[in-house]
């Protein structure tokens, strides 16, 4: 899932991710 990877990379880069789901991750 390309969108999942994009979300994961974005959250990892910001070091501000909250949780990972089947659809990606939620940033807070």
UniProtKB/Swiss-Prot annotation:
GO terms for molecular function: phospholipase A2 activity; toxin activity. Expressed by the venom gland. It catalyses: a 1,2-diacyl-sn-glycero-3-phosphocholine + H2O = a 1-acyl-sn-glycero-3-phosphocholine + a fatty acid + H(+). It comes from the Eukaryota. Keywords: Calcium, Hydrolase, Lipid degradation, Lipid metabolism, Neurotoxin, Presynaptic neurotoxin, Secreted, Toxin. Binds 1 Ca(2+) ion. Its EC number is 3.1.1.4. InterPro entries: PLipase_A2_dom_sf. One of its GO terms (cellular component) is extracellular region. It is found in: Secreted. Belongs to the phospholipase A2 family. Group I subfamily. This is Phospholipase A2 2.
């Amino acid at each position: 899932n390309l969108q999942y990877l994009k979300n994961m990379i974005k959250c990892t880069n910001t070091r501000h991710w909250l949780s990972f789901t089947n659809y990606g991750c939620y940033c807070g």
